[in-house]
Each structure stands twice: as C-alpha cells, then as structure tokens.
Amino acid sequence: MTYAATCIVAYLLGSIPVSLLVARRHGVDLRRTADGNPGAWNALEQLGPRRAWPAFAGDALKGTGAGLLGIAAGGVWLGYVAVGAAMLGHAFPLFAGL
C-alpha cells in the first residue's frame, strides 16, 4: 500500500501546473499566449527571467520532492518510481483545467 500511495502522491505533485500559477499571478494566461504551451519555457518568454524563475524552480522541486518522498517511504527504488510518477503527472496533469 505504501508504494501505491507514494506513486499517487508523486503523480499529484507532478500535476501541479506551477508555470500556470506563476503566470496567473502576473496576469498572464500561458495557454492563450505564444504557442499555448503552459510550460516554464513559455513562462520565460512571456514573463521574462525575473518573473519566470519560480516556474523553473517549482518544476525542479516537484521532481525533487517526489524523489525524496519515495526514498523516505521505501528506499532508492521507490524514489526512482516516484520521480517517474511525478514526470507522468507533469506530462499528463490531472489539474490541467486550472
């Protein structure tokens, strides 16, 4: 059960659309600008480096947090699996409609 719960939490962590939240804080909807990609690179192009760095940091912290959660819950192997689950959440986010 610990493995499944860790993977679910890691997936949900990866699903948080950090770039969209950062851009929304600055009054920009990334899905309606440039190529429509709600990612950190589009945030950089639309907001500039000073305002977009939290998007890059948030994406990095999602993966790091998932890995540390997995290691704490079940060792290195589960850490790798948790990072994979976070990557799946990042690529196929549950919270895409935010």
Would you name each region that the model predicts?
Residues L20-A52:
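Cytosolic, membrane-interface loops and tails of multi-pass inner-membrane proteins
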Residues T2-R24, R50-L98:
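Alpha-helical transmembrane segments
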